[in-house]
Amino acid sequence: VNRTVVGKIPTRYRGGRCRAGAAIALAGVVTFAGARSAHATLYTLKSPTDVVVGQDKSVVTVYEDTLYDLARKFSLGSEELIRVNPGIDPWLPGAGKTLVVPDSHILPPGPHEGIVVNLPEHRLYYYPKPKRGGPIQVITYPVSIGKMDWRTPLGLTHVIGKQKNPVWYPPESVRKEHAEAGDPLPPSVPSGPDNPLGLFAMRLAAGNGTYLIHGTNNPIAVGLAVTHGCIRMYPDDVAALFPLIPVGTPVRLINEPIKVAWVDGELLLEAHPPVDAQGQSFEPDIDQFAERLRAAVGETTVAIHWDYAREVLEKADGVLATVALEADDPNAPLPATPPASPGDAPRDPGTAAPAPSAPSGAGR
């Protein structure tokens, strides 16, 4: 890999523009009260090669707000919003506080079809089947994933059934766990406010049909690793998604804590806390991250700010950041020589111009 380390280029991404040195670039400031219902956004890709959707924004709190309410309003997991607003009390943020609302995403790798769930991101992407000749569209929602030994399986599966007002039949292993914790469960839990499946459920082929995408009776926990291997959504989100999903829809469950993308000569990095086989977060592997970044760079000549890239990885707040810029290749062929102006000394077109001197710190 041909790369050069340069001085500081830390940036945060803003929907197609980057601003050097900015802590974060925000689009608009919204004052909001009474957050209750989630609102996912339908993004239309201008090109099949588009890799980034959305734009970060900010919100000014009023007295009644909590970060849990605002997370639900802006279709974020509660932990996702808390992580990018350190030092803010999630239950009592107070009035007049300006909060970051992270709403830009690098699309997961792979085909733009069906449902994709990225476990470290705690986020679901749905690509509706486009009309003939129509553009690719994507809707995204926050989700909870499995924890401990209730592992959410990875790989390709599909929806094999759908049910409104589902009855929950706790598996024997789950009933045993609850009994040992002093919270015994009945053999079945009818549909209603106490049903942890919520009002809508979609059954996956994975695990012999034991895994579901479903609602919840505990919205605060959306965005966390709290479920018994299933994928939990906000009640309003699953109600909106449910009628869009036909039986047979492909579902890909992936584990991609690091997403990278080239946009207009800038290498964007989106980092989330890695998760282990049981869905639990752990410290990032810096060496693994460096290899992933090198793979993204390939043979492109770039200027990478490694210190800032590692800082973004360690923070793992999911906010897009520019960590490298495409650089001019000093070995590239010269452009055609323009016509000589009167008085110009003749020049041999085959003579290369002097190579530019390397920036301070090059090669380290």
Report residues per predicted region.
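Gly/Pro-biased beta-strand-loop elements
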Residues: 108-219, 240-243, 271-353
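Primarily a LysM-type cell-wall glycan-binding module
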Residues: 42-75
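Bacterial N-terminal signal peptides
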Residues: 21-33
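N-terminal secretory signal peptides that target proteins for export/translocation
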Residues: 1-17
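Intrinsically disordered, low-complexity Ser/Thr-rich linker and spacer segments
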Residues: 45-49, 102-119, 262-263
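LysM (lysin motif) carbohydrate-binding repeats in extracellular/periplasmic proteins that recognize
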Residues: 62-92, 134-137
